[in-house]
Amino acid sequence: MEAAGYDLIVAGAGPAGSACAITAARAGARVLLLEKDHFPRHKVCGEFVSPESLELLRGLLGEKQLSYHTPVSAARIFVDGKTLAFPVSPAAQSIPRFELDARLFQAVQQAGALVREGVTIQQVRHEGAFQVETTHETFTAKAVVNATGRWSKLTQFEVVNKQNWLGLKAHFSEASPPQSVDLYFFTGGYCGVTPVDANTVNACAMVRADVARSLEEVFASEPRLLRRSRDWQPMFPAVTTSPLYFHEPQTEADGMVLVGDAAGFIDPFAGDGISLALQSGTLAAQMLTPFLRGKYSLEQARLEYQTAYRKRFVRAFRNAARLRTALAAPRWMRSVALTVAAMPGIGQMLVRGTRARSL
């Protein structure tokens, strides 16, 4: 059965897809947002929103503001028995995806877009108008935005790293956790720990599959993390995702505009994944709006988005990749790098280098 046409169909209702749908709907577009899951749900994520995107997030949420969040005012890096600490100023926020995604999804509906949960997209065809085929219906639209994540079946890219990496995440009880994002590095991976509230932390790891396949194995891989986690009690079963692959950011595939992890997956230790999702989704909607209003072609809109995306985001991806290489270097080289990073102002400069330029 073929359904009515739309100006824009957004595939995927994570932060990137919801930001895109909200922005386009507020600009007057007829928007359909399709999501394969149901809300609320947990996602593998460090749940860290950098300060550069907090104002954008508040604007997107409108009346659907978050009920709680926890400030993160410091960062600590634990590697090779050493600790590197520096302030995060202005403070970032720790926001559970369980609430964040659900509130953004509500804000999409508040903005006037139509939403469908539990819908799996089978394929997207571009023959003049776009035809989005789902299990039960086919929808048509002038443009399609792919926000279905880094390993979308709608697009496939050549990957940079061939190793099998996986992500794991769960919340654990911890009394009075520090208001810092703590990164524990070990051979074959790392684990980030951030406060969720006064009695809970989020532990999110990226690890090679030959090193660990559970969070308990991750914790055992770093002595200080093992000591810290001994009294932790899980708040829900761990969620996992794999494979984790990196590729050069790409803004378009098969005529669709790509946002969030579908466009590019930044190293999680950079702490900018949610911010990149919010900003790229918003930017895509802004660049598509003139096309949807008949002012210029879809090809020109995609080119405008590509140019703006590269200007604002590609530097962050490349700097994060350089840090990934440095962290995988021999121990003596890491020691030299840590000594340099500990110098006044260097740590903050490295963090700024992995941040997207704000809209």
Predicted features and spans:
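Predominantly flavin-linked oxidoreductase catalytic cores and closely associated redox partners
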Residues: 107-232
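Conserved Rossmann-like nucleotide-cofactor binding loop
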Residues: 16, 39, 151
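Conserved N-terminal glycine-rich FAD pyrophosphate-binding loop of Rossmann-like flavoproteins
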Residues: 38-58
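Glycine-rich FAD pyrophosphate-binding loop
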Residues: 9, 13, 25-45
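FAD/FMN-dependent oxidoreductases across multiple families
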Residues: 123, 210-288
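C-terminal helical "tail/cap" subdomain of flavin- and related membrane-associated enzymes
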Residues: 286-359
